[in-house]
């Protein structure tokens, strides 16, 4: 095995670990969401996340927390609060695989928001593919059927929140340290969550607290896995593997919750996946042309 192939496989391995962690997050969130209110889950998740990040803050020094954009951190925290509470609640009423397929639609929302907030010019082919992707989202959510539950739209609200986070990250992350982005967002989300969570408070058991700690730690763990992966392979090289998360989620949901993806979820995935892949690769080409022209 040559060095290039070894580096590629190692990078993909790190990326797959991020997918496993992401699926585990959804499974834990679903389990906890059936026992605790989503506001309380959000509070503990980001409270523990801020605790886990403290050693990194001490290691890198207090200068890593210096920021000239406190409003950005507050906005990220509010979006995280809204997105995570909506996502957790959605998981309590829909299968994990449905959540996974909806998460594939986030690049579609990001593309649309980028037009308004980043002044990006989008070629007509990407608009067509975006429309196709949203058709896949509609197929997944089944609003045209008798058994449609409107509360499943909380997933869509969460996806829009996460897309807004992507926009903010694209605009500001290069101007702020990663530690400060993570730490301040966790603090803000925990602070915002606490007053609302106190209205629905149920004291978690020892096992639930342990799961909440793991849930709070895993966000940083996923980021670590992704950074390791992207240090070895290009982000577009990992794109096809992103959709293995559906397989991982389906296996976990089957054994833990006895869930199995329905036909609508699978049909929606078949439509959304090619659409988002096209967007990812076309964005890569656009960035390459931009760099070549500079």
Curated annotation (Swiss-Prot):
GN (gene name): sam
Listed GO CC annotations: plasma membrane
Known function: Transports S-adenosylmethionine.
Keyword Transmembrane helix: yes
Domain of life, source organism: Bacteria
GO terms for biological process, alphabetical: amino acid transport
Organism: Rickettsia felis (strain ATCC VR-1525 / URRWXCal2) (Rickettsia azadi)
UniProt similarity note: Belongs to the drug/metabolite transporter (DMT) superfamily. 10 TMS drug/metabolite exporter (DME) (TC 2.A.7.3) family.
Cross-referenced PANTHER family: ACYL-MALONYL CONDENSING ENZYME-RELATED, SOLUTE CARRIER FAMILY 35 MEMBER G1
Localisation: Cell inner membrane
Domain EamA: residue ranges: 21-141, 160-280
This protein's name: S-adenosylmethionine uptake transporter
Residue intervals passing through the bilayer: 4-24, 39-59, 74-91, 98-118, 121-141, 148-168, 177-197, 207-227, 237-257, 260-280
Entries under InterPro entries matching the protein: EamA_dom
Coiled coil: none
Keywords from the named record: Amino-acid transport, Cell inner membrane, Cell membrane, Membrane, Repeat, Transmembrane, Transmembrane helix, Transport
A Pfam family hit: EamA
Membrane topology classification: Multi-pass membrane protein
Signal peptide span: none
């Amino acid at each position: 095995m040559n060095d290039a192939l070894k580096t590629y496989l190692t990078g993909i391995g790190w990326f797959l670990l991020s997918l496993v962690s992401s699926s585990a997050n959804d499974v834990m969130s679903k389990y906890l969401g059936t026992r605790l209110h989503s506001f309380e889950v959000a509070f503990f998740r980001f409270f523990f996340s801020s605790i886990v990040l403290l050693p990194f803050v001490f290691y890198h020094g207090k200068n890593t927390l210096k920021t000239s954009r406190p409003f950005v951190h507050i906005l990220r925290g509010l979006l995280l609060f809204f997105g995570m509470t909506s996502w957790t609640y959605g998981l309590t009423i829909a299968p994990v695989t449905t959540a996974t397929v909806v998460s594939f639609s986030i690049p579609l929302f990001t593309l649309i928001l980028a037009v308004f907030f980043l002044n990006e010019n989008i070629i007509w082919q990407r608009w067509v593919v975006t429309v196709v992707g949203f058709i896949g989202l509609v197929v997944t959510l089944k609003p045209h059927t008798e058994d449609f539950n409107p509360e499943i739209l909380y997933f869509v609200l969460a996806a829009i929140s996460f897309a807004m986070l992507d926009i903010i990250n694209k605009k500001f992350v290069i101007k702020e340290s990663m530690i400060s982005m993570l730490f301040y967002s966790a603090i803000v989300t925990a602070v915002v969550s606490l007053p609302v969570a106190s209205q629905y408070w149920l004291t978690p058991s020892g096992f639930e607290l342990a799961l909440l700690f793991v849930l709070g730690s895993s966000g940083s763990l996923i980021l670590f896995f992704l950074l390791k992966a992207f240090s070895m392979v290009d982000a577009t090289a990992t794109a096809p593997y992103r959709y293995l998360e559906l397989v991982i989620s389906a296996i976990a949901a089957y054994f833990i919750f006895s869930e199995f993806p329905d036909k609508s979820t699978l049909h929606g995935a078949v439509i959304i996946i090619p659409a988002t892949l096209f967007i990812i690769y076309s964005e890569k080409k656009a960035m390459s042309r931009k760099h070549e022209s500079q």
